[in-house]
């Protein structure tokens, strides 16, 4: 059985943050990430630190953030113990990289990725650990070929780890990024997994590496294809309207957001995923046979790619 190596995970996650930031800056060609390094004394409700990096007003990206954090606490918050009661009363460490990119152009999808590691320990008992993460895509004006490329890349990421991994983690993504009050998915999905510890530590660690590095391979070719597509006020207004769904999901359902806020995490870093602008419109209905209607009819429901 392979040994749990927290330091190796932390080092890798910091390197992954660097690598992703570099590739996104290259794609944007103008904006750079501004780093806000932060630290909290262990005596706080949630101690630890991180590197919040935010990009604004680029050629391609209106706003985006790539966060690394490593925090420790003496008790897990309710959002974590609700489905894992055995964690109650254990001290814990959580570390991860989380990112969201909001492009200017409505034809370029919003994207999100996350890889994380949790370990909960109690004296005299074996540690409870797991990995989690994934990546998902939220197009406003989707192209079939882009969606297929995104999911084919996800399949390639999963293939070395088992024949059924993609299907399982795709289905989990479809279920997780679903807004029950709207009756629709947030986007076209991708991969999502949590509580990953059924393999040995090293294999689980290798899987989050593949997912973390697969994000740019899946996303940047789509950005490259769509970033020069012409658009007007109609497309921009629809993009802002659909960004409202992103806000609704993150504030109402997202376990990472809830965990961070309930455990006394750093609010600015937790809410980094919010879009810079969004809008709501009462009782909106897309025009029949329009590109906007196509999004609802063909893409905001689970399907095989």
UniProtKB/Swiss-Prot annotation:
Q: What is its EC number?
A: 1.3.3.3
- Pfam family for this entry, one: Coprogen_oxidas
* Residues binding substrate: 98, 114-116, 264-266
Active site, per annotation: 112 (proton donor)
This protein's pathway: Porphyrin-containing compound metabolism; protoporphyrin-IX biosynthesis; protoporphyrinogen-IX from coproporphyrinogen-III (O2 route): step 1/1
Which cofactor is recorded for it?
Answer: a divalent metal cation
**Catalytic function, reaction form:** coproporphyrinogen III + O2 + 2 H(+) = protoporphyrinogen IX + 2 CO2 + 2 H2O
Q: Where in the cell is it found?
A: Cytoplasm
Task: Kindly report the protein's main subcellular placement as a broad class.
Answer: cytoplasm
Q: Which UniProt keywords apply?
A: Cytoplasm, Heme biosynthesis, Metal-binding, Oxidoreductase, Porphyrin biosynthesis
The entry's cellular-component GO terms read:
cytoplasm
The domain of life for this entry's organism is Bacteria
Quote the PROSITE patterns the UniProt record gives.
COPROGEN_OXIDASE
| Cytoplasm is among the record's keywords | yes
The biological processes this protein is annotated with in GO are: protoporphyrinogen IX biosynthetic process
Q: Where does a divalent metal cation bind?
A: 102, 112, 151, 181
Important for dimerization: region residues = 246-281
Give the main EC class. oxidoreductase
Q: Which GO terms label this protein's molecular function in UniProt? A: coproporphyrinogen oxidase activity; metal ion binding; protein homodimerization activity
> What PANTHER family does the database record attribute to this sequence?
COPROPORPHYRINOGEN III OXIDASE, MITOCHONDRIAL, OXYGEN-DEPENDENT COPROPORPHYRINOGEN-III OXIDASE, MITOCHONDRIAL
Family that this chain belongs to = Belongs to the aerobic coproporphyrinogen-III oxidase family.
Name the NCBIfam families for this protein: PRK05330.1
Its protein name is Oxygen-dependent coproporphyrinogen-III oxidase
Q: Which organism is it from?
A: Vibrio vulnificus (strain CMCP6)
